[in-house]
């Protein structure tokens, strides 16, 4: 039941976004700037999330290869 509520909520958000985009050419400059800032912020957050996930997956899946261990021999006195 929670999944259907989530899908309906996402659909409603998408419809509101589409309505905003359709009304954007007639909007006032302040509304255009505010909408652009919100879109830019959302895109930045998604990009940073993508970069963080890719860096994490790279370190988890492909651990750094270390060189061969060299045994240290004691020096004679």
Curated annotation (Swiss-Prot):
It is a single-pass membrane protein. InterPro entries: SMIM5 (IPR047133), SMIM5/18/22 (IPR031671). One of its GO terms (cellular component) is membrane. It comes from the Eukaryota. Keywords: Membrane, Transmembrane, Transmembrane helix. It is found in: Membrane. Pfam families: SMIM5_18_22. Its main location: membrane. The chain crosses the membrane at residues 32-52. This is Small integral membrane protein 5. The lineage of its organism: Eukaryota, Metazoa, Chordata, Craniata, Vertebrata.
């Amino acid at each position: 039941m929670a999944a259907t509520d989530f899908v309906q909520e996402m659909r409603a958000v998408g419809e509101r976004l589409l309505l905003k985009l359709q009304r954007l050419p007639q909007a006032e400059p302040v509304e255009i700037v505010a909408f652009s800032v919100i879109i830019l912020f959302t895109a930045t957050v998604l990009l940073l999330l993508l970069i963080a996930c890719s860096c994490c997956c790279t370190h988890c899946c492909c651990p750094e290869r270390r060189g061969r261990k060299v045994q240290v021999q004691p020096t004679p006195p």
